[in-house]
């Protein structure tokens, strides 16, 4: 599903590689935590999967896509199979909950009848059926993140990338969001989540991939946040 094969990413502005000879394989349907301190390479790792960056050397593959060889019109095709959730929600403030989710399908050319069928289904999945006509500023932070997750999941992506999705949320709301991501994962979607939240990582005991200074320092099944925890 996801393979990084001897991947190095060197930025001209830095003496140290952002990623240094990374070898990782993530299978279909896995739930993986990507951890490490700020500057460890987590964001670069995710940007490579989206073809937002190209590796200096090595190969990046997502499903059938040889990511670092994609050009032009093929990049949007890759991004149709990857959903993204961010810490800051990134909702369209002038659009309703329904329209925020529908927009993700409109931009890839889905027919109106398909949109009208699928959007209510995904709003039901994330527990927002009763708030389809609300604007983002009428929602709590947890509800806004549910909209962001619905938007990322509405096209039934093969992979869901979640970059600190609970970073702005209180512990109880964070747990609700993690329950939702687990439910999505059980549908067969591969979930890769970058986080600094050791409580979430320690409680869920999923696979943990840890980066430090651009190097892969740990890849552990049923891992916890720290080696000594």
UniProtKB/Swiss-Prot annotation:
Changing residue 84 to A: Does not affect ATPase activity. This is Cell division ATP-binding protein FtsE. Optimum temperature is 37 degrees Celsius for ATPase activity. It is a peripheral membrane protein. Residues 2-227 form the ABC transporter domain. Part of the ABC transporter FtsEX involved in cellular division. Has ATPase activity. One of its GO terms (biological process) is cell division. GO terms for molecular function: ATP binding; ATP hydrolysis activity; transmembrane transporter activity. It comes from Mycobacterium tuberculosis (strain ATCC 25177 / H37Ra). Belongs to the ABC transporter superfamily. PANTHER family: CELL DIVISION ATP-BINDING PROTEIN FTSE, IMPORT ATP-BINDING PROTEIN. It is found in: Cell membrane. Optimum pH is 7.4-7.8 for ATPase activity. One of its GO terms (cellular component) is plasma membrane. Keywords: ATP-binding, Cell cycle, Cell division, Cell membrane, Hydrolase, Membrane, Nucleotide-binding. Changing residue 42 to R: Does not bind ATP. Does not affect dimerization. The active form is a dimer, wherein the participating monomers are held together by non-covalent interactions, with the Cys-84 of each monomer present at the dimer interface. In vitro, under oxidizing environment, the dimer gets stabilized by the formation of Cys-84-Cys-84 disulfide bond. Requires magnesium or manganese for optimal activity. Inhibited by high concentrations of cobalt and by cupric phenanthroline. ATP binds at residues 36-43.
């Amino acid at each position: 599903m996801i393979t990084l094969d001897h991947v190095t990413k060197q930025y001209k502005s830095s003496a140290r590689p952002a990623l240094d000879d990374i070898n990782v394989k993530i299978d279909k349907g896995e739930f993986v935590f990507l951890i490490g301190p700020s500057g460890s390479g987590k964001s670069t790792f995710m940007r490579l999967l989206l073809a937002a960056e190209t590796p200096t050397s090595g190969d990046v593959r997502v499903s059938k896509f040889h990511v670092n060889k994609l050009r032009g019109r093929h990049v949007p095709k890759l991004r149709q199979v990857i959903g993204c959730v961010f810490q800051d929600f990134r909702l369209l403030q002038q659009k309703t909950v329904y329209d925020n989710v529908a927009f993700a399908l409109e931009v890839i050319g889905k027919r109106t009848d398909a949109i009208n069928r699928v959007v209510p289904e995904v709003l039901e999945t994330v527990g927002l059926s009763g708030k389809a006509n609300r604007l983002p500023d009428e929602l709590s932070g947890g509800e806004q993140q549910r909209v962001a997750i619905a938007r990322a999941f509405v096209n039934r992506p093969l992979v869901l990338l979640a970059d600190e999705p609970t970073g702005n949320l209180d512990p109880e709301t964070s747990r609700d969001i993690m329950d939702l991501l687990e439910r999505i994962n059980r549908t067969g979607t591969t979930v890769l989540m970058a986080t600094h939240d050791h409580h979430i990582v320690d409680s869920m005991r999923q696979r943990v991939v840890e980066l430090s200074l651009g190097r892969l320092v740990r890849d552990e099944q049923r891992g916890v946040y720290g080696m000594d925890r």
